[in-house]
Amino acid sequence: MISSQKDSFLKAYKEGKNFIPIVETWPADLETPLSTWLKLSSRDSHGVFLESVEGGENLGRWSIVATKPLWEAICNGEEIVKTWNNGKTETHRGDPFDILRSWTKEYKSTMLDDLPSIGQLYGSWGYELINRIEPSV
C-alpha cells in the first residue's frame, strides 16, 4: 500500500514542497526490512538502513531503507566536495556543518501523519568530524 496517495502528493506539491516522502507498507510476514535492504543495496553502493522499535517488537516498528542518494559529500578538513547523482561536482570551503545547512535550505519537505517524526536527510559522517562537535575528545 502506498501511504502517500496521489491527492496528498499533489496537495504538498501545490504548497511548494519539493521533497515529499513516498511510503510503502506491507505485512511483516512477507518481507523483512533487512531482506528489503539487501535486495536494494545490491544495486547501489550508497544507501542507508535504519530500524527502530517503539512499543515492542510487534507494535510501532518502522524501518527506513534509502538508496540512490541525490548527492554525496566528502569532507577533507575545510574542503567539502559535493557530487551529484549525475556526476557533477562542486567544491566548497568552510565548516562542513554550516555548508550542509546551506545545502539543505532549498528542500521543503512535508511529513505524513502516519510517519514517525524523523528528519529526511540520511547519511554518515566520518570519524574526523567529531572534533568539530567535541573538540576535547
Language model segments and positions:
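Signature of the chorismate-utilizing enzyme
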Residues: 1-137
